[in-house]
Amino acid sequence: MEYGKYNELEVIKKDRWFYELEGGVKLPFDACGDIEIIIGNKVNPFVYMDVEKGLMGTLGTVFGQVGELAYLHVVATSDMGAFLDLGIGKHVLLLKNKMEVEVKEGDDILVALKLDNKNRIAATM
């Protein structure tokens, strides 16, 4: 399984709030869109690490995958860096020391997507 990318995974069971996919990936009901999910079938979710919830998946469209360049929207900035919208609900962090130019909220910027040391999706310029 590759984090930060689409993966073909089998649906193992239905839980209270999500479907459990092979590899321990949780696919929340609200991340399924209009796709009918059947136990035993395969789905193609985008898989990412959520620090609080563990391995998560979405069947929605994301704006880029790990190993790719992507134009992402800056939704907020802080002393740490900029938070970018990848389309997964959680924002991707572009650390200040990874910025080649200063960015501000509302900008659309070109970044490379990678995994950090905790397998979370991160951005760099």
Label for each model-derived stretch:
Residues 1-125:
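Single-stranded RNA-binding regions, centering on S1/OB-family and related RNA-binding modules
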